[in-house]
Amino acid sequence: MSDEAARRVTFSFAAPVDNAAAWNLDLDVFANGLLQAFPGASATREGELGPHPSDALRIEIPLGGGAWLEGLVTMPYPKVGSVLALTASAAEAAVLARWIRDFYAPSPDLVYFTSDLALDQGATDYGQIPSSGDTQAIACVLQEHIDDMDE
């Protein structure tokens, strides 16, 4: 599933800014669901990270063909946090985004995203993951985001 030539960025997936606790984030529940959905995946507690103490969970998801997606789930406040797809192509990050949308978020319209590329450019608006559609549809939205930021 890995595309070596694809542009890689770090994507951040989260609940809507105006309803940050909408996912009711729980690292143990997240880890258990991820491990069940992706055989061979790993989820390891990292403890507190960053300037504001934040519980964290390091994740690795097998994508096939020897490719892996690395990620980090951080929870700086109870029930509130984000999920990072680290240095990923749009297609790779879409696998994680779809799982969050379809199996973790309580409603498919509660998954928003940004990227390190956007934040580096001062962009503060979050995009929304489509509330329906397959992994390819999500990958297209993420790739459009990268393309817009690269212009």
Named regions from a protein language model:
Residues 33-87:
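Short, intrinsically disordered low-complexity segments
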